[in-house]
Amino acid sequence: YEKNHDLAQALWKEDIRECKILAGMLQPIETFYPEIADIWVENIRNIEIAELTCMNLFQHLPYAPAKSFHWIADEQEYIQTCGFLTAARLLMKKGDMTERASGELLDQAICAVHSDSYHVRNAALLVIRKYMQHSEEHAFQVCRLVEGMADSTLEGEQMLYNMVKEETEE
């Protein structure tokens, strides 16, 4: 498909599933400014659109790393979910980040496994998994963070511990 900013913007404004999917595919990166990204992410109302827009558009943005952290810090379910999904995709593409950024990402993701939102929890677990898959050092780092959760009575910590355990046994 040929990229087309005006068409993508018009499609996004339609409250129709297929229009939003196509908008994410047609939007040129060069004209998709951070302010527009924030408007789009605020209009995401379901997990399918969140996943597809992160895959087709958000992960390719030059400002995606900073924007994903900004979204992760948001309280709204789908904004936070998009932040984690975008970060997970960036980890699959690049995987490298500063120690400070990786520490912040892990802190936020570990906190998010306690979220009441199923989608936020799953996206947080995904970003932790992708972080671990990047290197043995990352996997070891996460293992150290969750080793005390083996006997936790908190559901989120149990899910995280079991996911990390599965990931390290593969």
Language model region names:
Residues Y1-E170:
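Alpha-helical scaffold domains
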